[in-house]
């Protein structure tokens, strides 16, 4: 049974937090990805890794081809796209969509799209912040202000070992 394409279900089906298995999330690029496209992929890996947490994550890379039998992320601009998305409509800004993977009966693809490379980065930053409500098959983030830079050693899961750390801070239910 093919699932509907709904951004509201994210991170499913791309990340399964109900099992103890590591996340495997292939990244698909056009034949020659730009440095900014790779930055968007790094932001995607950071988002997925944060959600996979202790389960671990692996990000196999594909160029110009869709992986068989797996959900995956694909990066698309109006001028650079894998051939299997040659008919994907041009976009007018940062956009993330969920669609049916080609040649598959059940898998989905997360399409990170933009007019240019900067839009890809903007789309993934918006998704990574997780502050927007996403409904339907497409999310078009509005322009967002960059958050203030974090202080050194201020990461969300950082434990300050200069003081006592209660065991309860190490457990997540």
Residue ranges, per PLM feature:
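Solvent-exposed alpha-helical segments and adjacent loops
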Residues: 1-173
């Amino acid at each position: 049974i093919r699932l509907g394409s709904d951004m509201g279900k994210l991170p499913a089906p791309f990340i399964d937090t109900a099992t103890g298995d590591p996340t495997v999330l292939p990244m698909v690029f056009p034949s020659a990805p730009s440095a900014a496209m790779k930055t968007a992929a790094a932001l995607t890996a950071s988002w997925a890794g944060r959600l996979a947490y202790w389960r671990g994550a692996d990000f196999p890379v594909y160029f110009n081809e869709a992986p068989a039998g797996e959900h995956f992320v694909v990066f698309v601009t109006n001028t650079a796209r894998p051939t299997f998305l040659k008919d994907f409509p041009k976009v007018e800004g940062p956009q993330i969509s969920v669609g049916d993977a080609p040649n598959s009966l059940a898998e989905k693809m997360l399409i990170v799209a933009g007019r240019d490379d900067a839009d890809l980065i903007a789309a993934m930053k918006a998704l990574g912040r997780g502050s927007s409500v996403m409904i339907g098959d497409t999310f078009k983030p509005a322009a967002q202000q960059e958050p203030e830079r974090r202080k050194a050693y201020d990461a969300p899961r950082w434990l300050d070992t200069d003081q006592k750390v209660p065991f309860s801070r190490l457990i997540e239910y």
